[in-house]
Amino acid sequence: MESRLGWLTRLNYDTGSALRRTSIIGTIGPKTNNPETLVELRKAGLNIVRMNFSHGSYEYHQSVIDNARKSEELYPGRPLAIALDTKGPEIRTGTTVDNVDYPIPPNHEMIFTTDDQYAKSCDDKVMFVDYKNITKVIEKGRVIYVDDGVLSFEVLEVVDDKTLKVKSLNAGKICSHKGVNLPGTDVDLPALSEKDKSDLRFGVKNGVHMVFASFIRTAGDILTIREILGEDGKDIKIIAKIENQQGVNNFDEILKVTDGVMVARGDLGIEIPAPQVFAVQKMLIAKCNLAGKPVICATQMLESMTYNPRPTRAEVSDVGNAVLDGADCVMLSGETAKGIYPINAVKTMAETALIAEQAIPYVPTYDDLRNLTPKPTPTSETIAAAAVAATFEQKAKAIVVLSTSGDTTRLVSKYKPNVPIVMVTRNPRAARYCHLHRGVFPFVYEQEAADEWTDDVEARLNFGVEKSKELGILSEGDTIVTIQGFASGVGHSNTLRVLTV
């Protein structure tokens, strides 16, 4: 049996003609929000466009959607997915007098209050916080972080139902409208703000393909979002962003109801001790892999490339290790939203992911997934797992899946084949969703269905093979494994074949 250590001792990091299978998500900002730049980003490796709804107007986000679709007209290439990242429930400070930034020395004592009369008149003596229940949930001795942890305060006393007495633990400046984190404290904020609800309705109206749901704490939060998306948004995939201790604690229940997960390490690294983040990342990714749910690794992956043309060695290792952990997607934030080198950042991420994929011990990984998956599995999963096993034995170059909904494609991706998964579908939305799953290369078949089912199967299969040749996945004489159904529609994938191109 192949071992992980044995695989690594023989590691060949020459990628040759291999194609990257990890998807790349890029946040679009003013510097990249035009069709021409989006085309270049896609050529560099971008698969999913992210809109950050913490910033920008509806007019701006509409322009991102329009430009993303225009880029596909200019450069058809592979289908491009569009994701809406919600602002989510959050806690913020009030407005300082004249918007002045007040210096705070260490051991400075002051008041945090939820009294609305201070909302627009904060200073270095009294700071308004917009979370009304903060005095009910926090305890003496707890730490409060302001501005992503730039300032830390210890709670000295819960004075009354509106007032906390706090002491600064370090020097800094207290400013208007900064984020507030309460590490180790369970908060009872609503799953969605009114802004979030409006944003989701905007996303449904504009046909976004996925929602990155911020600050998910319970499974109920996902169900609330699904309710807001409604019938018109029933096909939108919900990706739960795990950003706090509550989300980690309730992860198993969240995983059951979400379509996928994002390990959002920014706020997570504030809410839990930073040294624990890498371990939590590995645990969450492993659970997603076993469940067959897509998982995204995000935040500061190539942060230095916001202003520098080359990444740090630690950043390259971070991207590579996220791929080795089992992430389906890796994400760029400021690097592509406001950075000086957005295209280079995507290229760097693509090149790093490609090399990292050569380091994955595919057979041991497959064995782990098969052994740990509860039996019996549904027919479609049994076929998917068998297809991946067949690629190892037959030395196949690709798995071609004729798919309607994309679910069988998801299951094939779960078992981490060492070859591309070529998805042929008539469903353009399913083709875009599948970028959430590692290794999937989608092609939309636009021809009407043939009268004879077998003729239609062969036509779609030939289409997938020809497109794969164009992309460099297949050549004449290559062996492929195919999955198809015995009838049209969803849920009939039960036939596996081994063919020669």
Swiss-Prot record:
Pathway involvement of the protein, from the record: Carbohydrate degradation; glycolysis; pyruvate from D-glyceraldehyde 3-phosphate: step 5/5
Binding site for ATP: 52-55, 92, 178
Positions of disulphide bridges: none
Cellular component GO terms, alphabetical: cytoplasm
EC number(s) reported in the record: 2.7.1.40
Names of required cofactors: Mg(2+); K(+)
Keywords assigned by UniProt, alphabetized: ATP-binding, Glycolysis, Kinase, Magnesium, Metal-binding, Nucleotide-binding, Potassium, Pyruvate, Transferase
Binding residues for Mg(2+): 243, 267
Classification via Pfam families: PK (PF00224), PK_C (PF02887)
Binding-site residues for substrate, renumbered to this chain: 50, 266-267, 299
GO biological process: glycolytic process
Assembly: Homotetramer.
Official protein name in the record: Pyruvate kinase
Species whose genome carries this gene: Eremothecium gossypii (strain ATCC 10895 / CBS 109.51 / FGSC 9923 / NRRL Y-1056) (Yeast)
Name of the coding gene: PYK1
